[in-house]
Amino acid sequence: MAKLAKRIQKIREGVDPTKLVALSDAISMVKERAVAKFDETIEIAMNLGVDPRHADQMVRGVVNLPNGTGRDVRVAVFARGAKADEARAAGAEVVGAEDLVEIVQGGKIDFDRCIATPDMMPLVGRLGKVLGPRGMMPNPKVGTVTMDVAGAVKASKGGAVEFRVEKAGIIHAGIGKASFEAKALEENIKAFADAVIKAKPAGAKGNYVKRVAISSTMGPGVKIDPSSVTA
């Protein structure tokens, strides 16, 4: 336990929780402190000036990160016939209709992202209580209810990241791995921030992007000057 506390203290050295730093410096600090024995995920958290309890202040969307996420994303597709074949050919790991609904209702969810053709939604709607809390419910607004299942599968595996503001007005997402080059992380972060800004709801008043921070899975958060992300 003493060794763990010492390691945590060492990782946190040089990180001032009250100081805002430029994006490039923040990336360097986070990468230097990603010392776990696995390839840590680099995560971004954005505090927004919205209250998602109001429908006109909800923020959600999807962004294709230019350099991918570094994750091996397992995709499930609810489809029948030719569209099911199309999904398999595109690389979807799990494809089905009524049979897949039964599997998910039984508690087996061995996928990270879920796609459905429009005709399947009355069936998939039964899974709202299971998929909804996990942020996996297919939604046409983020391109996961579509007839272009091949395109959706490829996007999911190629770096598509969904985002949705939480109750406290925070959006967070994984935007790469510690092994990524600094420039690749910077490009991903700016692409993510740009998508969040473009998704600004009509009901948002005042300062929209209030705070931004990045961190690795096991490392401390580093606060970023919002202007270096949103410029």
Swiss-Prot record:
Please give the superkingdom of this protein's source: Bacteria
Disulfide-bonded cysteines: none
Enumerate the Gene Ontology biological process terms.
regulation of translation; translation
Q: Which UniProt keywords apply?
A: Repressor, Ribonucleoprotein, Ribosomal protein, RNA-binding, rRNA-binding, Translation regulation, tRNA-binding
A molecular-function term among this protein's GO annotations: structural constituent of ribosome
Query: Which terms in the GO cellular component ontology are assigned?
Result: cytosolic large ribosomal subunit
Subunit composition? Part of the 50S ribosomal subunit.
| Family as reported in the entry's similarity comment | Belongs to the universal ribosomal protein uL1 family.
Main function: Binds directly to 23S rRNA. The L1 stalk is quite mobile in the ribosome, and is involved in E site tRNA release.
Protein name stated in the entry:
Large ribosomal subunit protein uL1
Q: What gene does this protein come from? A: rplA
